[in-house]
């Protein structure tokens, strides 16, 4: 693997959120390699990628989330790959936290975090779906449950 960690952005059409996603990845306290993958190429995507120095990879064929995300994963040449959807924004310490967790858990294959929703410029931290997802991830946080054989 060429890189320790790669952010692989999945972009579709001309999303108004794409640039905020890119900026959040570029502003990481620990830099990671960034690529952009799309099955819906456009001059808008190309301009943003050029502005931020990000290589673009185009998947040909019908656009669908399964094949697009698999393509994004396979184009990333990294030990760890984060599939970043175009409307995701990452905390500036995300990559640092990932690499720190890797040092603590040598057999780590999945890294999961909490998240918040940005709606109309406000952070939503406690809606029903967020609490359900937190509950479902709880066994991953408890060592006794996450290392069952």
Regions found by a protein language model. Give the residues of each.
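Short, flexible, basic/aromatic active-site loop/helix in glycosyltransferases
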Residues: 129-149
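The conserved acidic donor/metal-binding loop of glycosyltransferases
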Residues: 85-89, 114
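A conserved acidic beta->alpha catalytic loop
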Residues: 36-45
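Short aromatic/hydrophobic "clamp" motif used to bind/position activated sugar donors
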Residues: 81
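Glycine-rich, basic loop-to-helix element that forms the pyrophosphate-binding segment
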Residues: 60-76
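Conserved donor NDP-sugar-binding/catalytic core segment of glycosyltransferases
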Residues: 93-129
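Short, acidic, metal-binding catalytic loop of nucleotide-sugar glycosyltransferases
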Residues: 23-32
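N-proximal low-complexity "stem/linker" segments adjacent to membrane-targeting elements
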Residues: 1-24
């Amino acid at each position: 693997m060429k890189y320790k960690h790669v952010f692989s952005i999945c972009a579709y059409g001309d999303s108004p959120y794409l640039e905020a996603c890119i900026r959040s990845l570029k502003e990481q306290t620990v830099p990671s390699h960034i690529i952009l993958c799309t099955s819906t190429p456009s001059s808008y995507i190309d301009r943003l990628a050029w502005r931020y120095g990000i290589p673009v990879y185009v998947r040909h064929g019908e656009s669908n989330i399964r094949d697009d995300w698999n393509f994004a994963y396979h184009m990333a040449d990294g030990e760890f790959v984060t599939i970043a959807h175009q409307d995701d924004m990452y905390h500036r310490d995300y990559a640092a936290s990932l690499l720190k967790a890797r040092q603590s858990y040598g057999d780590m294959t999945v890294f999961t975090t909490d998240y918040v929703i940005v709606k109309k410029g406000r952070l939503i931290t406690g809606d029903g779906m967020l609490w359900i997802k937190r509950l479902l991830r709880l066994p991953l946080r408890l060592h006794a449950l996450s290392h069952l054989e």
